[in-house]
Amino acid sequence: MDKVKLERMKNDKGFIAALDQSGGSTPKALAAYGVPETAYSNEKEMFDLVHAMRTRIITGKAFNSNNILGAILFEQTMEREIEGMPTADFLWEKKKILPFLKVDKGLADLKDGVQLMKPIPNLDAMLKHAVEKHIFGTKMRSVIKEANPKGIKAVVDQQFELGIQIAKAGLVPIIEPEVDIKSPDKAKCEEILKKELEEHLKTLPKDLLVMFKLSIPTKENLYEEFTKHPQVVRVVALSGGYSRDDANKLLAKNRGMIASFSRALAEGLFASQSDAEFNATLEKTIKGVYEASIT
């Protein structure tokens, strides 16, 4: 593990930009950007358009290391180039922003009040390739909808099992057990989740590091102790369906937690904007998310 990169992720101010919408969520992301489904006729054209959108964000002046520590990429984005360089290399070498790779293959059906991750075939090969591509860490998401202890334990078991495999490959896994913000039992889910995360950290091999990506908790500073744990590099928050302003306000109340927003980051950006308008909007967004992340 590169000490310079690790120190940057652990100690510097800023947030993580999530640019990892995958196949299923790409049409939605493009539509929000003002690109209708009629603008493309196949998957290749769709991914070309979304890469153009991501390139526009990443090459934006405001998308810089003063505000942003890392960026989470979809596998296709990792395989592509920005200004003639592989995306991950462009991020680190030109911007000093750490690249992360989304590794999960989506969610399984609801069972015991949760959605586990679908199996990830060829994970070892993907991790080996990610290391070759100079990726720093990974991200994988499960969802908790009900305060079911059995289900929540299964989510954290799966996340840590894969997280250990990822950490052993030389990457820093972002463990993301999202609590659905619409859950009527949200606070209860979070209490159970916190206990499970504590238990799993106790048995995490001492030479391995993880990160947590969590819904902004109902009880302020619920996860603060994790921000001080020697094996937790960083605790980041997902926006989870809140508007950007609401997510920023709620995040600012949680010490040590930084943002990792995707939809909230792209809010207000449109394909039709001039570069000046696009960059001004991006700068304003980044400033707001950054401010909420340094409290």
Swiss-Prot record:
UniProt keyword Lyase present: yes
Disulfide links within the chain: none
HAMAP family xref list: FBP_aldolase_1 (MF_00729)
Catalysed conversion reaction: beta-D-fructose 1,6-bisphosphate = D-glyceraldehyde 3-phosphate + dihydroxyacetone phosphate
Identification of the protein by name: Fructose-bisphosphate aldolase class 1
Gene Ontology terms for molecular function: fructose-bisphosphate aldolase activity
Protein's pathway: Carbohydrate degradation; glycolysis; D-glyceraldehyde 3-phosphate and glycerone phosphate from D-glucose: step 4/4
Source organism superkingdom: Bacteria
Keywords tagged on the record: Glycolysis, Lyase, Schiff base
Active site: E176, K213
EC number: 4.1.2.13
UniProt record, GO biological process: glycolytic process
Coiled-coil annotated residue ranges, if any: none
Enzyme class: lyase
InterPro entries with a match to the protein in the record: Aldolase_TIM, FBA_I, FBA_I_Gram+-type
Family to which the UniProt record says this protein belongs: Belongs to the class I fructose-bisphosphate aldolase family.
